[in-house]
From Swiss-Prot:
Belongs to the glycosyltransferase 29 family. Residues 24-375 are lumenal. This is Alpha-2,8-sialyltransferase 8B. It comes from Rattus norvegicus (Rat). It is found in: Golgi apparatus membrane; Secreted; Cell membrane. It is a single-pass type II membrane protein.
């Protein structure tokens, strides 16, 4: 009788998880504003569910609080200066890693592998689900044969966001001391080395960066600028989300063609079709009600798999710093962004609050001011 009762309880919990995940995916569908075919998203959900038991990030013995605050009230949640005591909580870090592994495995999900696709294969875009792309010969040639993170493990990892809070931080030297450095969206480093460092082991490149930072490669000058940036990576992993939306197809192909034509020394990676929904599912089941995870949150979630200690820099989604000084959205350009806009696909202040909670518990270290030794 006791065994039968346990079976019924397990079945009920399983149905609850399925219901919650499908509700979350329906929410994504409404945000994107598309209608029609659901095959691709449903298959991503099924894949996610196959790895997920409902797990919670433990903060002070309980799960992360559900947070809906999108105002600049989050500025009140200040971070202590770099010189303040911070101690790594290894027990919590390991627990988070195990929980995330129930949703995704960064070693596998960081990239689709060559053996899983062939030229001409049809892929449904993650967000434009009624649109498809064919795997091109160039894309196929650049798919890795094995995971670029296979059997990799690092003592310390730095994830460098792009907030203007990095300016005058003097964090460059500290960032470069870490075992593995992750950067976002091909952000420039040479001219900002004192504040952001130079070392790069993995850098992401959303297709929109080609439009915004390299003028859609409209002429030879812009193509040369992109080539210089790519050559500067010098063997790093270039992580290109090629399967997100239809609008990025041409830009991904342009970059792939340049890499092959000029024999650029990079290791390309193209994230799995299930990764984004798996990451979102993990945070949602921990009561962090994000919309679409930012690149920074994606990178943190992946890094828990292969990094013992994780240090975040340049994560600050507010227009003012802790001293009420203006902060640029990006340290390297004049782009404006509505952090609390309902139209934004991201919920950056909410993500920050979750990361700050983890910082306070020692699961990661979040630096938002000057680094030790900065002058």
């Amino acid at each position: 009788m006791q065994l039968q009762f346990r079976s019924w309880m397990l079945a009920a919990l399983t149905l609850l998880v399925v219901f919650l995940i499908f509700a979350d995916i329906s929410e994504i569908e409404e945000e994107i504003g598309n209608s029609g075919g659901r095959g691709t998203i449903r298959s991503a959900v099924n894949s996610l569910h196959s790895k997920s038991n409902r797990a919670e990030v433990v903060i002070n013995g309980s799960s992360l609080p559900a947070v809906a605050d999108r105002s600049n009230e989050s500025l009140k949640h200040s971070i202590q200066p770099a010189s303040s005591k911070w101690r790594h909580n290894q027990t919590l870090s390991l627990r988070i890693r195990k929980q995330i592994l129930k949703f995704l495995d960064a070693e596998k999900d960081i990239s689709v592998l060559k053996g899983t696709l062939k030229p001409g294969d049809i892929i449904h875009y993650i967000f434009d689900r009624d649109s498809t792309m064919n795997v091109s010969q160039n894309l196929y040639e650049l798919l890795p044969r094995t995971s670029p993170l296979k059997n990799k493990h690092f003592q310390t990892c730095a994830i460098v966001g792009n907030s203007g809070v990095l300016l005058n931080s003097g964090c460059g030297q500290e960032i470069d001391t870490h075992s593995f450095v992750i950067r976002c969206n091909l952000a420039p480093v040479q001219e900002y080395a004192r504040d952001v460092g130079l070392k790069t082991d993995l850098v992401t490149m959303n297709p929109s960066v080609i439009q915004r930072a390299f003028e859609d490669l409209v002429n030879a000058t812009w193509r040369e600028k992109l080539l210089q940036r790519l050559h500067g990576l010098n063997g790093s992993i270039l992580w290109i989300p090629a399967f997100m939306a239809r609008g990025g197809k041409e830009r991904v192909e342009w970059v792939n063609a340049l890499i092959l034509k000029h024999h650029v020394n990079v290791r390309t990676a193209y994230p799995s079709l299930r990764l984004l929904h798996a990451v979102r599912g993990y945070w949602l089941t921990n009561k962090v009600h994000i919309k679409r995870p930012t690149t920074g949150l994606l990178m943190y979630t992946l890094a828990t798999r292969f990094c013992n200690q994780i240090y975040l820099y340049g994560f600050w989604p507010f227009p003012l710093d802790q001293n009420q000084n203006p902060v640029k959205y990006h340290y390297y350009d004049s782009l404006k962004y509505g952090y609390t806009s309902q139209a934004s696909p991201h919920t950056m202040p909410l993500e920050f609050k979750a990361l700050k909670s983890l910082h306070e518990q020692g699961a990661l270290k979040l630096t938002v001011g000057q680094c030790d030794g900065a002058t």
